[in-house]
Amino acid sequence: MLTNMKKFFIFVLTLFFLNIVNAESYYIKDVNYKITGITRQYALETKVKIDKKKIFESEDELRKYLDDIVIQMLNTRTFDTVTYTCVIDDLQSTEDSISEKSNTENNDNTEESVLPQNTSNNTQTKNVTVTFFTNDTKHLIATPYPKYKSGDCLTAMIKVKDTNFAGSMENFTANVDFAVELNKDDEPESFKTGFSTDFGIPFKMGKLDTVWDNSIDFSYTFGDSSPEWNFGTGLKMALPFDKYSLIFNIKQSFIKNFDYDGEWKGTGEYRTYYKYNDSLYFVENVGFSIPIVIQEVNNWGRIYYTPFVNATYNWDFDGIHNDDTYLLGPGMTFGQTISTGRVNWIENFRNGINVSLTQIFGYNFNSYAFNPGITAELKLYKAFKNLGLSADLYAYAYMNGTDNFGSRLRGIRKDQYYDSDDPNIAILKSTDAQAAFVFNFDMPIKLFRIYWEKVPVINKIKASSKFNLEAQISPFLDIALFKNEETGTSFNIKDSFISGGIEGIVYPLRWKGIQVRGSLGIDLTRKMPVLKGKVNQDWRESCKSYEISIGIGLHY
């Protein structure tokens, strides 16, 4: 019996040592791209980074990593299909592999020169050459496009949107429009026409990953003495290293905006006009940040810690008015962010999490105002076969400042004021708060997917297949708890905003990066019998209790 046990242990130990002696590992030596479409290789390499320093302990581990890279590429919504092949070279020692690699690369500190490491002297390393095959999805759309936002504007436009501009995997938008601006009661207030465009062009500048950002917005309101505009251009430059990047931003804007000529504040007897004469001004903005990778998570991504600093200076030829708190400066913001996230698209539903926590310290050198604050956001997505669940939890608090959360609430007019006898409060918008917690919940449901080439009569139209689509309907609920200046309460459900409604979403199957969304939101605190009368609304002015919105893109 003892003899058999000894033989068994000797056999096991022999297998163990043979496994060590003959252990094989892998690292990605070369990556090639076979792109069908206009996507540029540099853009794809920048958007989805591939680790050429990591040692994989088995072929299975390597395959799982490459499968995850495919998912990341598909998550960009730039490609219809992504596949790969890999060629594994003959065995060679890790030491030889590293020596060969070091002879073919420059010896510097940038990401490309960091060599794969393996602590085992007996491990044999195989070099792997990977080739990715991608097919671009349709990315350019030009169409007549109505846009409507209750209490804001009704716009008829010709819209051009390109989600892969010049193969850059960056967005390009351009609009030529005619708009009817509406007041809070949805009555026409003014008529305007104009055009706008916004795009970024990534390129390599030495060792810097650079994006040239440009924006043009030009409009004329009938009856005004001159047009308005916002011309901006800037550079974002990143120097990448293995576990961090150095990012520098610079931007200049030239703006003509009559909103800063003066403004009305308050309602009723407290409505007052403040004259600034700051309609023509310039904006200088510089920023610096260091995203640092504090943890790598397999099949997930990276957890980042990012310290940052940003400075903004608004100026005009005769100086910014002392009462123009929107433009008065210069101002500087220091801060730090911890963030991570991974959201996978499963057909037209999302699955994953995005989370960020930011601490901010702001200072205005003109007003000497110090404004520390904190923001946090958690986005959750869960995909099922024919429906999805989505939630966005957003919170912020500032010591000496406010932020407007109205755009996050569908059904709540963001420009409504407090109904107060205190003139200092009556001039404040009720959706401007020093602290707030906003919760959005959506449940998109797949209604149908239609292929027009399979529909009788319509299938005789040659281009019918280009308009194949999936339609979804999504009930939603939005809630905002906040510091209420009129009632003096904080995060009290009885002094809150609650809205709900329904969205219709269309996904063009040939344009994966584009969604068309229509939304009807209702102010439930004023219209829903269960809530009406039970939630205090005396603190805000009376206005329309619904909001309709039509546009491109998802709410969050």
Regions of interest found by a model, annotated:
Residues 23-153, 159, 173-203, 219-228, ...:
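Periplasmic polypeptide-binding modules associated with outer-membrane biogenesis and secretion
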Residues 162-164, 201-203, 237-241, 288-294, ...:
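Residue-level signature of outer-membrane beta-barrel architecture
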Residues 138-150, 156-158, 162, 169-186, ...:
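Transmembrane beta-strand segments that form the barrel wall of outer-membrane beta-barrel proteins
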Residues 182-190, 215-229, 250-280, 393-432, ...:
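Outer-membrane beta-barrel translocator/channel fold
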Residues 189-321:
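Transmembrane beta-barrel wall of Gram-negative outer-membrane proteins
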Residues 305-493, 526-555:
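C-terminal outer-membrane beta-barrel translocator/porin domains of Gram-negative envelope proteins
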Residues 154-158, 193-197, 229-235, 282-288, ...:
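Hydrophobic, lipid-facing positions within transmembrane beta-strands of outer-membrane proteins
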Residues 126-128, 138-142, 154, 168-172, ...:
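Outer-envelope beta-barrel architecture signal
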